[in-house]
UniProtKB/Swiss-Prot annotation:
Function according to Swiss-Prot or TrEMBL: NDH-1 shuttles electrons from an unknown electron donor, via FMN and iron-sulfur (Fe-S) centers, to quinones in the respiratory and/or the photosynthetic chain. The immediate electron acceptor for the enzyme in this species is believed to be plastoquinone. Couples the redox reaction to proton translocation, and thus conserves the redox energy in a proton gradient. Cyanobacterial NDH-1 also plays a role in inorganic carbon-concentration.
E.C. numbers: 7.1.1.-
This protein's encoding gene: ndhN
GO terms of molecular function: oxidoreductase activity, acting on NAD(P)H, quinone or similar compound as acceptor; quinone binding
PANTHER family in alphabetical order: NAD(P)H-QUINONE OXIDOREDUCTASE SUBUNIT N, CHLOROPLASTIC
Bilayer disposition of the protein: Peripheral membrane protein
Organism of derivation: Rippkaea orientalis (strain PCC 8801 / RF-1)
The name this protein goes by in its record: NAD(P)H-quinone oxidoreductase subunit N
First-level EC class: translocase
Length: 158
C-alpha cells in the first residue's frame, strides 16, 4: 500500500496552486499512478485530450453548440445550410454537479497540453479560482522523470 500513499508533494502542490504543468516520461505509465494517488486522497479525476477542444471555456464550463458532420446529406429549407446545431452540456460543470458530497473535488487531467495557446493556458490557470473544487493538471511535454511546476509560473516564463 506504500505506492498509494506516496506522491504527497504532488498533491500538496496541486492543492496550493490549483493548476499544475506536468512533464512526464514519454514511455507513459506515470499519469495513471498519479491519478490513482489523487483518487486515494479523495479527488475524482477526468482525463481528456487538448486536441479538438475548441473554445476551452465554453467546452468546460458553458453549454455550447456542436455541428456534427453532415456526411453529404442536407435538409433543404428546414435547417441552416451548415447543418443542425446540437447543444452539449459543459464537461467540467456537469462532472462537478455529480460529485459525491464527501469528495475533495475534481481534477481535470489534460493530455497534449503543448498545443494550447497562451490565452487558453491562462484561462486554465485561473479556472481553480473561479471554481474552488476544480483542479487542473496539464501535460506540457516530456521529461526523463516525472516533474511538475505550478501552471502560472510556466505561463510567466513563456
Amino acid at each position: 500500500m506504500a505506492l498509494l500513499t506516496n506522491g504527497k508533494g504532488f498533491i500538496r502542490a496541486l492543492e496550493k496552486s490549483g493548476s499544475l504543468a506536468v512533464y512526464a516520461p514519454l514511455e507513459g505509465g506515470f499519469e495513471g499512478r498519479y491519478q490513482r494517488r489523487l483518487r486515494t486522497n479523495g479527488y475524482h479525476t477526468f482525463s481528456l485530450t487538448a486536441r479538438g477542444l475548441g473554445d476551452v471555456s465554453a467546452y468546460l464550463m458553458g453549454v455550447h453548440g456542436v455541428r456534427p458532420p453532415h456526411l453529404g446529406k442536407k435538409n433543404i429549407g428546414q435547417e441552416a445550410a451548415v447543418g443542425p446545431v446540437y447543444f452539449v452540456p459543459p464537461i467540467a460543470a456537469y462532472q462537478l454537479e455529480t460529485l459525491p458530497p464527501k469528495s475533495k473535488g475534481l481534477v481535470l487531467w489534460i493530455l497534449e497540453g503543448f498545443i494550447l495557446s497562451q490565452t487558453e493556458l491562462e484561462y486554465l490557470a485561473n479556472l481553480p479560482t473561479l471554481e474552488p473544487r476544480l483542479k487542473v493538471v496539464i501535460e506540457l511535454g516530456g521529461e526523463r522523470y516525472f516533474s511538475w511546476k505550478p501552471l502560472p509560473e510556466v505561463i510567466k516564463v513563456a
